[in-house]
Amino acid sequence: MTIDTAAWPAGRVNSLGFAKPPHETRVVAAMSGGVDSSVVAAMLKAEGYDVIGITLQLYDHGAAIEKKGACCAGQDIHDARNVSDAIGIPHYVLDYESRFREQVMEDFADTYLSGSTPIPCIRCNQTVKFADLLATAKELGADCLATGHYIRRTDGPEGPELHRAQDASRDQSYFLFATTRAQLDFLRFPLGSLPKSEVRELAEKFALQVAAKPDSQDICFVPDGSYAKVVEKLRPGSGRGGEIVHLDGRVLGKHEGVIHYTIGQRRGLGVATGDPLFVVKIDAPARRVIVGPREALMTRGLLLEELNWLGQGSLEEAATHGARVLIRVRSTRPPVPGRLGYEDGVPAVFFDAPEEGVARGQAAVLYDLEGSTRILGGGFIARPLPADERVVAA
């Protein structure tokens, strides 16, 4: 069903926040070929917007055609094109393989080699989707770029704000903390207030061929879940072995490369001591994997880098005054209370109670402590601050 836009009252704001009728509002819909982005395009078209669909070809098109659960490659490009044809909008495919490899895949490999644990989906949003694609949308004369992310954007007193999705089980705020205010001004997230079940129903209502398509899973360019294989392919010779060392200094065994390990890992260590051991630190330059008891995983705080602040006032003011925040260190964990501050002049967050198994390279996302859904920003973890001094000295 379409909306009659023939008579549009002066000053009336459309569903995307513009004071003009939908047919005068150009929207670029980022289409990955999945259900969510397809529903966004169909919804906007049904409301009468001037919609253009764009899909980014991000990696090895040929090898990815048969891969299930990927995005932005192979069959997904065909699906996005077919959906666009079905709903009657123009569709374009932009080849961003080189850009994606340079900004996302190369960074992924180098981050693992440094002993950190990367989050390529954040890098992709930050350096490709919300940078290059957004710029392309503006070049096409679009008023905004709409995506299928489960997150909400609202207009606040200091500009656009980012809020958690209505459906907590689908909330993607952890992966979108790096979105800047300038980007938020141009972005729209039509699914932020909808549960996934309703999105599936809409896909069926619009008779989209992707209505029953599974959600994308894992990292799109890691076909079998083996991160180490991808790193080895991008950085031949990266699997150089070294020692597995206990916190007390004992050498317990050998490993085949730090790229096979992450903080908090217990399985696959290949050492037997009778007591449960976990990876508590990775010394990449020395090629040492340091293990210890579970209590050695506890972290009192985190030094942050590339910090993006979306809260009130400036980051400097918030950190200087020790602003109280909620901190999320993994997408699967609930946020925990703490405060902003500085450690040795570097922006940091400090937990009210020590947090377990926090890895360098992951994200620390900040939320409003006062029960609201607002995302205050976040940063990448430059260095955890261990509660156990043995880990500091190791």
Swiss-Prot record:
Gene3D superfamilies referenced in this protein's UniProt entry, alphabetically: Adenine nucleotide alpha hydrolases-like domains (2.30.30.280), HUPs (3.40.50.620), Translation factors (2.40.30.10)
Disulfide bonds: C124-C220
SUPFAM superfamilies, per the entry: Adenine nucleotide alpha hydrolases-like (SSF52402)
Region (Interaction with tRNA): 170-172
One GO CC term on file: cytoplasm
Record-given protein name: tRNA-specific 2-thiouridylase MnmA
Pfam families reported in the protein's UniProt record: tRNA_Me_trans, tRNA_Me_trans_C, tRNA_Me_trans_M
Species assigned in the record: Hyphomonas neptunium (strain ATCC 15444)
MF-aspect GO terms: ATP binding; tRNA binding; tRNA-uridine 2-sulfurtransferase activity
Entry keyword set: ATP-binding, Cytoplasm, Disulfide bond, Nucleotide-binding, RNA-binding, Transferase, tRNA processing, tRNA-binding
E.C. number(s) listed in UniProt: 2.8.1.13
Entry's family note: Belongs to the MnmA/TRMU family.
Subcellular location: Cytoplasm
Catalytic-site annotation from UniProt: C124, C220
EC class (word): transferase
Entry binding sites for ATP: A30, M31, S32, G33, G34, V35, D36, S37, L56, G148
Highest taxon in the source lineage: Bacteria
NCBIfam families: PRK00143.1, trmU
